[in-house]
Regions:
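Short, conserved catalytic-motif segment at the N-terminal edge
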Residues: 3-54, 77
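Short, well-ordered beta-strand elements
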Residues: 277-290
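Short, gly/Ser/Thr-rich active-site loops of penicillin-recognizing serine hydrolases
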Residues: 246, 290-311
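Short, glycine/proline-biased beta-turn/loop segments that scaffold the active-site neighborhood
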Residues: 79-94, 171
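Short, surface-exposed beta-strand/loop micro-motifs that present aromatic residues
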Residues: 266-279
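Active-site SXXK
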Residues: 10-11, 24, 30, 52-80, ...
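Short beta-strand scaffold segments in enzyme catalytic cores
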Residues: 22-26, 254, 270
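Short, surface-exposed loop or secondary-structure junction motifs
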Residues: 34, 94-263
Length: 311
C-alpha cells in the first residue's frame, strides 16, 4: 500500500541520519492520516509529536504571497501580465511582469554583493536594482517572491503580515501560522535558538518577507491544503502559467502533471492533487545536524515520487 511505502522510506531516511525526525500527513478518501517519527530536538531528547511549529522556509511562498496573488488573479482584480514598475516605479524592471515573478521566469541575477552586511532598507533597495542575466530563463529565486511581497504591500497599502493575516489565515482559521521569530518551535540548526528564522534575507526583512520566514503546524497546513482541494479559486491551477517553453509552473507552485508542490530549504514540502483529491504535508528540520542540500533533494524526491505514484 502507498502509505506503508511512504512511511518506510521516511523511517529509512531518519535511520540514515538525513533528518532527525519528521511530521507527515497524507490526505486521501476525504481524510487525513498523520504520523510523527524520530526526534524534533535531539539535543534535548524530544520526540516528534503533534502540534509542533516548524520553520517553513520557502513553503512560505505559497502559504502567503502566492495565495493572495491567486485570489487577485482569480477574481479578475489583477492582470498578472502587468509590469513590476506599475507597482514599484522605483525599480529597474519595466520589462518584467508579475507572471514572470510568480513563475520564476525572469532574467534577474539574484546575487547581491555584501548581502550579509546590509540593513533591511538597504537590502530592499538593492532588490530594485539587480543585475540581469543574458535572457529570461527558469531560475528559482527568493528575489522574485520578495518583490511580489513588496508589490502586495503597495496594492493593499498594508504591511505584508497584516495582508496575509486578513486575506488568508484569519478567514481560513489558520491560527498557528505566523512570521518568525517565534518563542517555541522545532530547532532548525543545533545550537541556534529555536524559533529564529533560518533564511537570512527573510530574517532581516521580518514581516515584510514574501519568500520565507513563516512558521506553521501540520494542523494549519491541513486547513490550507483542504481549501486548495475544494475552493473555486484553485480550480484552474493545474495548468502551465509560465511564459517559458522549457519549464512548466503554476502560479507560485511547481507543476508535475496534476500534482502541485512547493518545497522549503529547512526540510519541508507540501503537495496536492485536485483531480485525485490527494494531498501531503512533510515537515522536518533536515538542517539540524548538517546541510547537504544536493543529497537532500535526492532523498526528498524519493518521498515525493512515492506520494505521486498511482496505487
Amino acid at each position: 500500500m502507498k502509505w506503508t511505502k511512504i512511511i518506510k522510506k521516511i523511517e529509512e531516511q531518519i535511520e540514515a541520519g538525513i533528518y532527525p525526525g519528521a511530521s507527515f500527513a497524507y490526505f486521501k478518501d476525504n481524510q487525513w492520516t498523520e504520523v510523527y517519527l524520530g526526534q524534533s530536538d535531539p539535543e534535548h531528547g524530544l520526540d516528534t509529536e503533534t502540534g509542533l511549529l516548524y520553520d517553513l522556509a520557502s513553503v512560505s511562498k505559497v502559504v502567503g504571497v502566492g495565495t493572495v496573488f491567486t485570489f487577485l488573479w482569480e477574481k479578475g482584480k489583477l492582470d498578472i501580465d502587468r509590469p513590476v514598475t506599475d507597482f514599484l516605479p522605483e525599480s529597474d524592471y519595466p520589462d518584467i511582469t508579475i507572471r514572470q515573478l510568480l513563475t520564476h521566469a525572469t532574467n534577474l541575477d539574484p546575487f547581491i554583493p555584501n548581502r550579509d552586511l546590509l540593513t533591511a532598507s538597504e537590502l530592499k533597495e538593492a532588490m530594485f536594482h539587480l543585475n540581469r542575466r543574458n535572457q529570461p530563463a527558469f531560475l528559482y529565486s527568493d528575489v522574485h517572491f520578495l518583490l511580489l511581497g513588496f508589490i502586495l504591500e503597495r496594492i493593499f497599502n498594508q504591511d505584508l503580515d497584516v495582508i496575509l493575516q486578513e486575506q488568508v489565515w484569519k478567514p481560513w482559521k489558520m491560527k498557528e501560522t505566523q512570521f518568525g521569530p517565534v518563542e517555541l518551535a522545532v530547532p532548525t540548526v543545533r545550537g541556534v535558538d529555536a524559533g529564529m528564522v533560518h533564511d537570512p534575507k527573510a530574517r532581516l526583512l521580518g514581516r515584510h518577507a514574501g519568500s520565507a520566514g513563516l512558521f506553521s503546524t501540520v494542523k494549519d497546513l491541513q486547513i490550507f491544503l483542504e481549501h486548495y482541494l475544494a475552493d473555486g479559486f484553485a480550480r484552474d491551477l493545474s495548468q502551465n502559467f509560465s511564459p517559458l517553453d522549457d519549464k512548466e509552473r503554476s502560479l507560485a507552485w511547481n507543476l508535475e502533471g496534476d500534482w502541485l508542490d512547493h518545497t522549503g530549504y529547512t526540510g519541508t514540502f507540501i503537495m496536492w492533487n485536485r483531480q485525485n483529491q490527494e494531498a501531503a504535508i512533510f515537515l522536518s528540520n533536515r538542517t539540524y545536524e548538517k546541510d547537504e542540500r544536493a543529497q537532500w533533494i535526492v532523498d526528498r524526491n524519493q518521498v515525493m515520487d512515492l506520494i505521486r505514484k498511482e496505487e
